[in-house]
Amino acid sequence: MGPEAKFYNYFKKNTPNISYTRIENTSSLGTPDVLAYNKNNVFFTIEFKVTKSKKVRFSPHQIAFHVKHPINTFICIKTPDACGLRLYEGSRIRELVACGLELEACCLGLAACRLKLE
């Protein structure tokens, strides 16, 4: 199991009020990792990333997806710094590509991310 799959499993285990459907899609490149559904009856997608540096790698297809679908899309990044976890809105993907982890996240840490998404 790769680092992003491990991160997804950790996140899923620690957000029990969210229903997740893992998307394994080889025909539509750039589709986020999961389709999620919260207790407020809201669907959203999450792209999970793990980085050991301040840069986050995205494929051109992932960037295009978030540019085309800026609402209810999120990018959740496991980082090596003290906060450990950052959540960004998909609408900010171009800034995230350009600035990396210097870009201010909408949430820092698991508890804040859980509150935002639940």
Where do the language-model regions lie?
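Short, flexible beta-strand-to-coil junctions
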Residues: K39-N40, T51, I77-A82
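Acidic-basic catalytic patches of nuclease active cores, encompassing PD-(D/E)XK
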Residues: M1-N25, K39
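Beta-rich catalytic cores
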Residues: G30
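Nucleic-acid nuclease catalytic cores
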Residues: K68-R92
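Mg2+/Mn2+-dependent nuclease catalytic core
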Residues: K52-H69
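Conserved catalytic cores of phosphodiester-cleaving nucleases, focusing on short active-site segments
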Residues: V34-A36, V42-K52
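Class I S-adenosyl-L-methionine-dependent methyltransferase catalytic core
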Residues: R94-L96
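Long, intrinsically disordered low-complexity tandem-repeat segments
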Residues: A98-C99, L103-L115
